[in-house]
Amino acid sequence: MPKVWTDDTALMEGMTDNLFEALYKMPKYFLRIDDIAHSLGMPISSLLVLCVLREGKISIGEISERLCIAKPNVTPLVETLCARGLISRQRSDKDRRKVLVGLMPEGEAMVERIRGAIRDQMMSWPRDYNLSEMKRVNNALAATLEVAD
């Protein structure tokens, strides 16, 4: 039987330790998403919906799956964001039973505000990080996101 990555005890222990540390270090040193959400006057879950929709129109079920939020909890988020004029809902041309959710121009502007808030936070990172370290962080993030897709 072929060996799977979970059979590698050292790898599993290392990843467990790294993910454990990331739980508290990522928000402290890199991205304080709660501060961003508060500054924009929306809950974190609504902010995350907007971030997911940046990739294009998707169904409520796909939003639920990507954010690991139960479908019944996604619907009120979508309704609230629709009421704010940030997103819209429309029936799929391919499957009339499916409702697609997408960004409105105001939602696209809000996504840019989120990106700007992230840039602002990056500007407040300690100046003693050097260019080489920041390139390593960026490459590690890119590799992690590539694997996650």
Per-range role (PLM):
Residues 4-5, 60, 148:
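Secondary-structure edge/capping motif, primarily at the C-terminal ends of alpha-helices
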Residues 15-33, 106, 117, 121, ...:
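C-terminal ligand-sensing/allosteric alpha-helical core of TetR-family HTH transcriptional regulators
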Residues 31-73:
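N-terminal helix-turn-helix DNA-binding core of bacterial DNA-binding proteins
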Residues 79-142:
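Charged, amphipathic alpha-helical coiled-coil/dimerization segments
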